[in-house]
Amino acid sequence: MGTRFLLALFLVLLVLGFEVQGAHLPQQEESASPALLTQMQESLSSYWDSAKAAASKLYQKTYLPTVDEKLRDMYSKSTAAMSTYAGILTDQVLSMLKGEE
C-alpha cells in the first residue's frame, strides 16, 4: 500500500509541476491586482481539480475491493481513536484552565 500511495503522490506532483510550467503569465501593472488575485484563485482551483481528477483516475485504475475494505476499516478505527484522544486532550485543557478547586 505504501508504494501505491507514493505512486499517487508522485503522479499528483507531476501533474501540478507540468501545470505550473505551462502557466507563464506576463507581468501586469499593480493596478490590476484584483485581476491577479482572481487569476491566482482560478489557477489554484484548476490545479486542485486536475489533482483530484488524477487521483480519482489512479484510484479507479488500481481499485481492489479487499484494499478498499481495509482502508475503510483503518479509517473507522483511527477516527475512533482520534476522537477518544481529542476528548482526553479537551478534558486536560479544561482542567488546566479551570484550575484546582
UniProtKB/Swiss-Prot annotation:
The lineage of its organism: Eukaryota, Metazoa, Chordata, Craniata, Vertebrata. It is found in: Secreted. The keyword Secreted applies. InterPro entries: Apo-CII, ApoC-II_dom_sf. Belongs to the apolipoprotein C2 family. Residues 78-101 are annotated as: Lipoprotein lipase cofactor. One of its GO terms (molecular function) is phospholipase activator activity. One of its GO terms (cellular component) is very-low-density lipoprotein particle. PANTHER family: APOLIPOPROTEIN C-II. Residues 66-74 are annotated as: Lipid binding. Transmembrane segments: none annotated. One of its GO terms (biological process) is lipid transport. It comes from the Eukaryota. Component of chylomicrons, very low-density lipoproteins (VLDL), low-density lipoproteins (LDL), and high-density lipoproteins (HDL) in plasma. Plays an important role in lipoprotein metabolism as an activator of lipoprotein lipase. Both proapolipoprotein C-II and apolipoprotein C-II can activate lipoprotein lipase. Keywords: Chylomicron, Glycoprotein, HDL, LDL, Lipid degradation, Lipid metabolism, Lipid transport, Secreted, Sialic acid, Signal, Transport, VLDL. Proapolipoprotein C-II is synthesized as a sialic acid containing glycoprotein which is subsequently desialylated prior to its proteolytic processing. Proapolipoprotein C-II, the major form found in plasma undergoes proteolytic cleavage of its N-terminal hexapeptide to generate apolipoprotein C-II, which occurs as the minor form in plasma. This is Apolipoprotein C-II. Residues 1-22 form the signal peptide. Pfam families: Apo-CII.
